[in-house]
Amino acid sequence: MHSDSDDYFSGDDDDFDRQQEIARSAFADMCHDWERNQKYDRALQLTIERLHCEGKEAHVLDIGTGSGLLSMMAVRAGADSVTACEAFRPMADCAERVIASNGMGDRIRLVKKKSTELKVGAGKDMERKANVLVTELFDTELIGEGAIATYRHALQFLLEEGCRVIPDKATVFAQVVECPLAMSWQTPKLLCSSDGDVLLRVPEEMVNCRGSSAVFDVQLSQLPLESFNALSEPIPVFEFDWSSREALKFKRHSRNLLKVQSSGIPQAVFMWWDLKMDLEGTVLLSCAPFWAHPDFEGLKTQKQNDSIPEPNLIPWRDHWMQAIYFLPHSKTPLAKGEEIALDAFHDEFSWWFGLNDLSLDPGHCSCGMHIAYSRSRIGQLNDGPRNKRILNYLEEVLDKNSVVLVLGDGSLLGLSIRAMGAKKVILVETNQTSRHCMERFVEHNGLENVEILSCLDDLTPDATADITHIFGEPFFTSAILPWENAIQFIWELNRVKALLNHEVSVIPHSFSIYGVAVEFLDLQKISAPLGTCEGFDLSLMDRMIEEHSKVADSPVEAQPLWEYPCLPLGPKCKMITINVAEGSQNQLEQGKITLTRHHEIKECNGIALWAEWHMGKNVSPKNTISSGPLSVIDEASELPVRPLQWNSNWRQGVHLLRKPLEESKMFLSWTVKYNAQLKTCYFKFD
């Protein structure tokens, strides 16, 4: 994806990467987190006030200052001195300007280094050790950005004995669950025909694999409550005392006895954490999902807007979410009332969990599938309605004489064509790990007349002479936005067609890109201007992010919209349809997305986009595969008054408006340009 210009950024790659890093950084997202800001501010006020009451000065160190916000809060709270450090140079330069524009340039000493590089002493980075540390070094896993090592270094070299630390402590919570939806993103299932006949069985090593070791961070509040069975209450499994170097260990284990509250198979652990911001624990910041959030019941009684669902009543943030950790594979159910031991482990950066297993090692993928494919791709492979629709169409158009070339990565549907009775299947698998996975499926299922090629160049003239059909789901691991799969399929298809001297049937026949105007409840905050934040002017940071975003970012980005609720403000709009067989031709389309209920809703702040694939020439719901909303939002239907339900196995496209659309406007103009040679679609919105 690129901007609405065909020209690539002309600077060097390092400069482009740096601009993109600034544009996509979470600095603005964190500053939009009003609860975080207010609770850091309150903790600073309480801490500095208490030190002064004890007759002590408050010398504050702010590690990773970002915008400079926490340092400015410390000055406002009465700190006697403030030293801030920021290693990311563009952000440090911006913080310097922000601090100066707020009249605090002479009150805050900004050092453009990592905290581990700071030196203490006369004429050095810090004149003296600090007795107050304020920092935000956390991610969804709490420790994934190296918080333990940073705190340990600061406590040893940069802080006085008995210093105050903000936040003071963190508690990690875990909840054991049975969650088929989460498991659909982890473990491939049997693939069956519409008659229930098994087409492909899954190799045991893939069923039993622990999966990817990368954190699975999600907005747990958006999981439907009916999609999981809580086998336990949330329990605290670890506490981190950020003021004690001795207590901050790089590796720990805890065994936690709990009573099963609901019968079921233990499949996963939901994890989150909270922060006690001050020494006395009077200020608490929780990252819990709504059903476990300490403020939820109180917020529910204050609810005034019926359009906001209960999961969105709690403070929203995207920089700290919750995480899912898969337990070692088990088919043994737990009984209600049974006592079990939840073993929790962490190293310097990550977590893992087990049941009744003191020696459990960190999980990693041993089968290759979780290395080759993302969790959402595994979800697509397990998507029953999608698979059924595609298989039904393939059963209609293929017969025992069909020789099918499959283009794409990890297509179990393509592989199943042989099990359906086709004469031969040829898979092109350019990714070595994906190719190994497909070979294991072939071997495990005893499939014959299946040829797996490492590249199209391996396609022989004899093989091409027999091809009757070319099929793609389509899916390619290189694609980010859903329609990029179809565009890559067209590119590969054109290469194959150059080798053919006869006509073949191509599936899918075409694809379309749709858009709808929406009001995001929270997602718009990741790019919305900050302006004033807790009384401080951050407009200079707004300007920096906007300038870099214009250069480095596409107007359409990928987001899993099932995690980010939005309300539709009008019917869906078909923006472009591309015939796959004729996809070598450039195409330009223009139009308007209409808003039929703009006056009812607070604001239009974005456009949601998705792709639909049409298997055959005659387009119908039966042969259409959508990566978009599950709700009907056409002109003939009444728009839903609740947030749209989205396909949770895809990331959709999102265009976020820098400023909400004016209330008087009832449409938004758009241009889509498909460039076949550059393999991309350009979008422009006015």
From Swiss-Prot:
Its EC number is 2.1.1.-. InterPro entries: Arg_MeTrfase, MeTrfase_PRMT7, PRMT_dom, SAM-dependent_MTases_sf. GO terms for molecular function: histone methyltransferase activity; protein-arginine omega-N symmetric methyltransferase activity. It comes from the Eukaryota. Pfam families: PrmA, PRMT_C. GO terms for biological process: peptidyl-arginine methylation. Belongs to the class I-like SAM-binding methyltransferase superfamily. Protein arginine N-methyltransferase family. PRMT7 subfamily. Essential arginine methyltransferase that can both catalyze the formation of omega-N monomethylarginine (MMA) and symmetrical dimethylarginine (sDMA). Specifically mediates the symmetrical dimethylation of arginine residues in the small nuclear ribonucleoproteins SmD1 and SmD3. This is Protein arginine N-methyltransferase 7. It comes from Aedes aegypti.
